[in-house]
Structure formats: C-alpha cells, structure tokens
C-alpha cells in the first residue's frame, strides 16, 4: 500500500487577531490603528483649515492623508468585523498597504514642511497651523512605518 504523505502547506494562516475591541487596541501591531486615524485626521483637518497657498504641494498632502485615513478605517473595520478571516494573504496585504502608505506619507510630510517654510512670512496663524500639520504628518508617517514593520514581523 502506498503511504499517504500529507502535502506541504501552500497557504498562510490568517493573522491571529485578539477577540474583542479592547484587546484589539491593546496589542501590537493593531494598537497603531487608532493613533494613525487620529493623527491622520488632524493632518488633513489642519491643512484644510488654512488658506491653501500652494495647491500642488498641499493638494498632495490632502490626497494622501484623506485617502490613507479612509483606507485605514476600512482596514480597522475589517479587523473588527472579522473580514480578514476570509483571505489567506491578509497579513501580506496589510504589511504592503502600511509600508506603501508610510512612503507616501513621508513624501507628503516633506512637502507639507516645505509649504510651511515658504508660508512663514505670510499670515502668522496659518503658519502655526501649518507647523502643527507638519508635525502630525511626520508623526503619522512614523506610525505607518512602525505598523508595517510590526505586522511583517508579527
């Protein structure tokens, strides 16, 4: 009789996500979702609150921050509702998304900082708002990069 060897595994297990909302927000890498959303919200709100003097620069910042906010919100909802269990390559998708978003956010952060430097001599209140937007943009960049590495190594 021929021996029945089990075939090698050809798929990856879905990520082990803790059950419950509180447990989800307290474990790495999933704890990065809420700060990413909050600080990303502050970026596009602060940029939109100023007079957009440089539409090409700050338009890219608004596009990256708003799109990243919405897609990250969809990722969070998919973790909360368990949609990730249906896909085998969810961990790779999550890591690629957050890595790509970290790179795009870095470009947006540099452009926002440049727009802040240029606007220094104009309206002082808009300058301070641009400084805050630059700070939150760099902070959000760091969070997205940390999330990408932590989901990759998790």
Swiss-Prot record:
The keyword Transmembrane helix applies. InterPro entries: MAL (IPR013295), Marvel (IPR008253), MARVEL-CKLF_proteins (IPR050578). Keywords: Membrane, Transmembrane, Transmembrane helix. PROSITE patterns: MARVEL. Disulfide bonds: none annotated. The chain crosses the membrane at residues 24-44, 61-81, 99-119, 131-151. Residues 24-154 form the MARVEL domain. It is a multi-pass membrane protein. Pfam families: MARVEL. The keyword Membrane applies. It is found in: Membrane. Its main location: membrane. One of its GO terms (cellular component) is membrane raft. Signal peptide: none annotated. Belongs to the MAL family. This is MAL-like protein. The lineage of its organism: Eukaryota, Metazoa, Chordata, Craniata, Vertebrata.
């Amino acid at each position: 009789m021929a021996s029945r060897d089990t075939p090698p595994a050809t798929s990856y297990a879905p990520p082990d996500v803790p059950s419950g909302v509180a447990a989800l927000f307290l474990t790495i890498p999933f704890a990065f979702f809420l700060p990413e959303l909050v600080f990303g919200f502050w970026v596009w709100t602060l940029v939109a609150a100023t007079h957009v003097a440089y539409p090409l620069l700050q338009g890219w910042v608004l596009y990256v921050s708003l799109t990243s906010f919405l897609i990250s919100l969809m990722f969070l909802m998919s973790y909360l509702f368990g949609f990730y269990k249906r896909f085998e390559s969810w961990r790779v998708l999550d890591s690629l998304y957050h890595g790509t978003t970290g790179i795009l956010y870095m470009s947006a952060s540099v452009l926002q900082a440049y727009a802040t430097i240029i606007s220094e001599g104009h309206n002082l209140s808009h300058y301070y708002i641009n400084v805050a937007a630059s700070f939150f943009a760099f902070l959000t960049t760091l969070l997205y990069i940390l999330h990408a590495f932590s989901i990759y190594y998790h």
